[in-house]
């Protein structure tokens, strides 16, 4: 049953809806607001030590583009399930694009920054623990993990543009802190409001540092 649900979700994002999602991510406003968003999120990091990053579910790479303007990144990887979005991602300068689902991806490399923005909300809840482990294992010692997702104190499934079982809100940060107790520390968090001068989609973000 778990496998069936996971496959349904992966097919959903691989298919036509994933392509439409790619089109919605081409907003000029979003490109501008992302830069301001990440500057705020990374205030408490040692930016000069962030030389590499990986993003899970980057779509066409707008987050990566914004971070390239803020950080001096030498190694960048994006793991994207949708083929069309992946092809766009692969065209970005200095980006290694991987066309896989997070469930089938295993990282041998470590990165100074691991990013999930609007990604965990689309993962089958029964696969979250493994996804958390993939995120943690991809992070270098003393590296940073940044997650920006829709928040709910209790797990809840939300209809997403008329589709069921493709969007789930919950307290991702607390779950990660419980799983990786004493292995990661929460060093900053905040909220991005859709009505801000540089709007985001009402995301709650959390910045962790992995212990060395």
Regions found by a protein language model. Give the residues of each.
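A conserved beta-strand element that flanks and buttresses the S-adenosyl-L-methionine
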Residues: 115
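Hydrophobic adenine-recognition pocket in adenosine-nucleotide-binding enzymes
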Residues: 119
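Class I (Rossmann-like) S-adenosyl-L-methionine-dependent methyltransferase catalytic domain
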Residues: 1-52, 56-106, 123-130, 134, ...
